[in-house]
Amino acid sequence: KVSFPTIDGVRYCEVTGDGTVRGLGSFDLTAAGEIAPSLAAILVFADKPTDMVGIGHLRGHETNRLEALVNEIRRIGGVAEELPDGLRIEPVPSETLHEANMETYADHRMATFATMLGLRIPDIQVINVATTRKTLPDFVGMWNGMLA
C-alpha cells in the first residue's frame, strides 16, 4: 500500500506491505536511469527476476555502473548479469546473502546502493561512503539520524 501523508506541512511517501519485494519482469528505466542503483538494491530481495533496460548509458558515468552493480551484487551472494542495454537481477534465497566490504568505485550512487543493502544484510561495510558528498554533503549524518 502506498500513501502520501502530510506531517507538519511536509508530504511524505509511505509504503507498507507484507515484506515481499516483487520482481518487475522487464522494466524500462530509460527516463529514470539515475535510480537504477537504488532500485537494484531493493530488487536483490525480489521474488522474481527483473531486467532493468534502457540504461546502457550507465556504463559511462563516474564508473561503469552496470559492471559495478553486477560485481557488488555477486559479492554479497546475489545473482546478476549485464545485458546489452541494462541489468538482470535474479532472485536468491535471502539467507544466502551475506556480509561484505562493498566497493563504491568513487561513485555516489554506488555508495547509496551499498548502504541500502546494509539495511537488510548485517555487517555490510561501505568503502568510501564519503563519495556521497557529491549529491548529499551530509549523507552520513542524515543516514545515522534516520537509523537513530
Residue ranges of model-derived segments:
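Conserved phosphate/oxyanion-binding catalytic-loop motifs
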Residues: A36, H108-A111
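Structural signal for terminal/edge beta-strands and the immediately following C-terminal loop/tail
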Residues: D123-A148
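Self-splicing inteins and homing endonuclease
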Residues: K1-A31, I76-A106, L119-I121, N144-A148
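C-terminal structural cap/anchor segments
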Residues: A31-I89
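Short helix-capping/linker segments at secondary-structure and domain boundaries
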Residues: F45-M52, L119-N128
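Short, recurring structural edge motifs at helix starts
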Residues: S26-T30, I55-L58, A100-E103, Q125-R133
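Short active-site-adjacent structural elements
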Residues: H61, I89-E90, L97-E99, M110-F113, ...
